[in-house]
Each structure stands twice: as structure tokens, then as C-alpha cells.
A protein has these predicted regions:
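Active-site nucleophile elbow and catalytic-triad environment of alpha/beta-hydrolase enzymes
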Residues: 213-229
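Conserved HGGG/HGGXW glycine-rich cap/lid loop of the alpha/beta-hydrolase fold
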Residues: 57-109
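Active-site loop/oxyanion-hole signature of alpha/beta-hydrolase fold enzymes
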Residues: 99-139
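C-terminal motif of bacterial Sec signal peptides marking the signal peptidase cleavage site
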Residues: 17-20
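Catalytic active-site module of serine/aspartate enzymes centered on a nucleophile-bearing elbow/loop
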Residues: 271-312
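Conserved alpha/beta-hydrolase "acid-adjacent" motif
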Residues: 246-254, 286
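Short beta-strand/loop motif that positions the catalytic acidic residue
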Residues: 233, 239-241
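Flexible "cap/lid" loop of the alpha/beta hydrolase fold
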Residues: 146-154, 160-196
Length: 312
């Protein structure tokens, strides 16, 4: 049974990544005309790109657009084009979008240090200092959500608002079968996938791919629990998961309650933090439903977050 689950998880990753590399005509049907045009455009060119020397890494980054800065943090095994190619143009219409490839991912070569959420959060902090950005909104997806949580805990002075898409702040925030699958996944499951092909095409030695997969997976086989620290984050938090996600509902609800949720807003006022459970959406499918999610994110980031609820 476990083997069956793991194989299905691997297939889902490959299929979803392949889909993310293709134009999403079906997905863009529900978006506004403006977003349709953006999503169907050719990828826009960065205003700035390069490598930042941070904590021993040469961290690859790209910057798009103008306005309030938002940093997008990718998921495991991903890179800028795989995770964000259809999303950057939409956010860049009104924001300065900073995207980077974290330790060992994409064009950021690995170094001999522990692969950890804490280290990668410190790298993001260093990148913002390199770019001379005092503070930013942070959006993290999956593994990037864990990095975003740690960024909020370790570098609160650099954070304005926090957006978590399908991320966890403790290891048992995943459904048990998902958590169990991490220990038995391996490089063979990605054979011939866009993940393997992009790893090779971005200047990495193909012989190192199995070691890369093992190191990335190491972050999820070690127990972690930042519940206390995360619940004390002062910045407003928007957490979104799919209703068929790998993240447990109660995990997201626990944080939302700690941030003032779980009460009727018409009586007690609206909390500054927000929660969304996206219907008909898997963990990987979150990236295919960004036409629903981006308007929610923009509203959260642009709102004055006053507690007064709307009236008739």
C-alpha cells in the first residue's frame, strides 16, 4: 500500500510539473481579461538578475516589475521557470517581484552545509540586504513555505506580510501517508521528468542528481516543530491549502486560530490574518489554481486589514 502511494505521489509530481511548463489555456478561462492576456504572453524579461554572495552561496536571483517588493520562494526540486513562469507576469504588473533559486536548486550550486529551512531563510535575508531592500512581503510554496515561516521567525524586521501556500510549520502537519512517503522517495522516481531535465540543463552535473534528490528530501525526514515561534509571528499571515492537499486541515486551522481566527467576524471583527481552503485542489495543483489564489493574495497584501466587517 505504501509503495502504491509513493509511486502515485511521484507520478503526480512529474505530471504537474509538466503541466506547469505548458500554456494553461483551460486554467485561464476563469481569470479576468487582464490576467488572461498576461498569462498568455511570452515570459517577461527581468529588470535585474545575477548572483548574490550570501552565507557561502552564490544565490541566483531575478527581479521583475516595480512597486512594493514581494519575494517568491519555490518548492522542493523546483526553480524559477518551473515554479513561477506563469505567475511572475501577473504579480509584476503592480509589484517588484524577487525570485531566487535556493541552495542546490536551479543555478544556485550546492555547498557543503546542512540543507535546512533555517539556513535557507538566512539566505533570503542576505539576498534582500544584497538588493538593498529593507522589508518585503514573502510568499512561500511547499518547501518555500517552511523557509518563509523561518524567515518570519528569524528576520521579523525584514518582513511586512507573510503568505504560505501549502506549507507546514511542523513535520506532522502533513497527512501521515505523505510524511511517510518522504523517507522512501528517490531519484529514480524523477527519471526523464522535467525536474531531472532542468537540473541537467541549468549547468548541473547529471551524476550529482541522485545526491541532490537525497539532500533535498533530508529536510522532510527530520522532525521539526516551530509551533510556538510561528504563533508568535507579529506580521499578518495568509495561509492557503487545497482541500485535497498534503497539509492537514487542522494544521492550517491551528495557526489561523492562534492569529485571531475561529470567531464570527460580524461580532468580534475581522482578524488581520487570513485562511483559505481551495476547493478541488491538491498540493501540486495549487500552482494550477493561481488564477483563484493571486486575487486573494493581492487583496491581503493591499488591504488595510481593518477589523471592521462589511455591512449590508
Amino acid at each position: 500500500m505504501k509503495k502504491h502511494i509513493i509511486i502515485n505521489l511521484s507520478i503526480a509530481i512529474v505530471v504537474a510539473v509538466m503541466a506547469s511548463c505548458q500554456p494553461r489555456n483551460k486554467d485561464t478561462q476563469a481569470v479576468s481579461t487582464e490576467q488572461k492576456e498576461t498569462a498568455n504572453n511570452q515570459p517577461i524579461q527581468p529588470a535585474d538578475s545575477g548572483y548574490a554572495d550570501v552565507n557561502g552561496l552564490k544565490m541566483y536571483y531575478e527581479v521583475y516589475g516595480e512597486g512594493k517588493p514581494i519575494v517568491l520562494l519555490h518548492g522542493s526540486f523546483m526553480n524559477i521557470p518551473l515554479n513561477w513562469s506563469h505567475i511572475i507576469p501577473v504579480f509584476a504588473k503592480n509589484r517588484k517581484v524577487i525570485v531566487a533559486e535556493m541552495q542546490g536548486h536551479g543555478r544556485t550550486k550546492d555547498i557543503p552545509r546542512e540543507f535546512s529551512y533555517e539556513n535557507m531563510a538566512d539566505d533570503v535575508s542576505g539576498l534582500l540586504k544584497h538588493l538593498k531592500i529593507d522589508s518585503a512581503d514573502i510568499l512561500g510554496y511547499s518547501m518555500g513555505g517552511g523557509v518563509a515561516f523561518q524567515f518570519a521567525v528569524r528576520h521579523p524586521e525584514q518582513l511586512r506580510r507573510l503568505v504560505i501556500l501549502s506549507g507546514t510549520y511542523k513535520h506532522d502537519g502533513w497527512w501521515p501517508d505523505v510524511e511517510a512517503s518522504f523517507a522512501t522517495m528517490n531519484a529514480d522516481m524523477f527519471k526523464g521528468s522535467p525536474i531531472e531535465k532542468q537540473y541537467d540543463s541549468l549547468g548541473n552535473d547529471p551524476k550529482n542528481f541522485p545526491a541532490y534528490v537525497k539532500k533535498v528530501l533530508s529536510i522532510d525526514v527530520k522532525p521539526y516543530d516551530w509551533s510556538k515561534e510561528v504563533k508568535n509571528i507579529k506580521a499578518p499571515v495568509f495561509i492557503a491549502i487545497g482541500d485535497a492537499d498534503g497539509v492537514q486541515y487542522e494544521h492550517a486551522l491551528e495557526l489561523f486560530r492562534a492569529k485571531g481566527g475561529g470567531k464570527m467576524g460580524d461580532i468580534h471583527g475581522l482578524p488581520k490574518s487570513r485562511l483559505a481552503i481551495i476547493p478541488g485542489t491538491t498540493h501540486i495543483g495549487m500552482m494550477q489554481h493561481m488564477d483563484w489564489i493571486i486575487p486573494m493574495v493581492n487583496d491581503f497584501l493591499d488591504s488595510d486589514l481593518k477589523p471592521t466587517p462589511p455591512t449590508f
